[in-house]
Amino acid sequence: MHEFVTICIMAAALGMDAFSVALGMGMLKLSGKQIFRIGLTIGLFHVAMPLAGMAVGKWLSGHFDVIATYIGGGLLLVIGVQMALNAFSDHEAEGLKPAGWGLLLFAVGVSLDSFSAGLSFGILGTEMFVTVGMIGAMSMVMSWIGLIVGSHFQKFLGAYGELLGGLVLIGFGLKIMLPL
């Protein structure tokens, strides 16, 4: 029972991280179909990354944690800068979009922290399928909530909403890269 509570708390924490970042991404003008795909992709990556972390194991954790931090923060920073720069542009952004490779890069950036969580769970020997299922489901649902809430804010804020979303992602990227 204690292990299940630990898994639930970790899944909620990783889900809140996904919610926060999705809130910023939700400031883009997204369709319901895009919101569904983004949340599903983030959920799938929150299954794949802990699995990868569990598979890699303890020997790589000391080296990859630092690299994962900078990669994840850097990806969020790039997406945030691109959103902020294109907030008041008359044409559609040519940079990273929440589709195709842009969506994959976004999902990787959001889910890199779950790789480290997977390392921890692998070391502790937790039940793999329950763990990654809980993390994936929680992250997917929290992403959908963040995207929907962000899209409602965007309706009121217009182009300023996309700028705000970009600044949120920049802030999270910097927070990840430069922990205080």
Curated annotation (Swiss-Prot):
Keywords, ordered alphabetically: Cell membrane, Ion transport, Manganese, Membrane, Transmembrane, Transmembrane helix, Transport
Matching InterPro entries: Mntp/YtaF (IPR003810), Put_MntP (IPR022929)
Pfam families, alphabetized: Mntp
GO cellular component: plasma membrane
Transmembrane segments: 4-24, 40-60, 64-84, 103-123, 129-149, 156-176
GO MF term (any one): manganese ion transmembrane transporter activity
Topology within the bilayer: Multi-pass membrane protein
Cellular localization per UniProt: Cell membrane
Entry function: Probably functions as a manganese efflux pump.
Family note: Belongs to the MntP (TC 9.B.29) family.
Protein name: Putative manganese efflux pump MntP
Protein source organism: Shouchella clausii (strain KSM-K16)
Lineage summary: Bacteria, Bacillati, Bacillota, Bacilli, Bacillales
